Design a protein with these regions (language model features):
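Active-site catalytic motif of lipid deacylating hydrolases and related acyltransferases
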Residues: 1-54
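Structural motif
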Residues: 2, 56-58, 81
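Active-site signature of alpha/beta-hydrolase-fold catalytic machinery across serine-
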Residues: 18, 71-75
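Short, charge-rich binding segments
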Residues: 52-53, 61, 74-76
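Short beta-strand immediately N-terminal to the catalytic nucleophile in serine-hydrolase-like folds
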Residues: 59-61, 85
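Gly/Ala-rich beta-loop-alpha elbow adjacent to hydrolase catalytic centers
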Residues: 61-65, 69
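A conserved short beta-strand
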Residues: 78-86
Length: 86
């Protein structure tokens, strides 16, 4: 199972580096904010391109990233685990 992390608005891989290194496996950082996505269709298309047909995904989201992760989990059957952080 591949793990992905979506941080809050304005965050980047450096903000979550220490947290992600504490986890027991590799976690890939996703940054939807740099793409200036305008709607749900663009968000879903971006996510589909990022996950590259994984069979099973754990999606971790923090703050606004948690809201996005929750929505994406409801739209993609590949997301089998969802972790929301505040």
């Amino acid at each position: 199972m591949k793990k992905y992390f979506i941080g809050g608005l304005g965050s980047n891989v450096y903000h979550s580096k220490d947290f992600l290194q504490e986890l027991d496996s590799q976690v890939y950082f996703l940054n939807p904010y740099e793409k200036h996505l305008r709607d749900e269709t663009e968000l879903k298309s971006w996510f589909k391109n990022e996950i590259v047909e994984e069979e099973s995904i754990c999606l971790i989201g923090h703050s606004l990233g948690g809201d996005l992760a929750r929505y994406l989990a409801s739209e993609f059957y590949e997301v089998t685990k969802l972790i929301l952080l505040d």
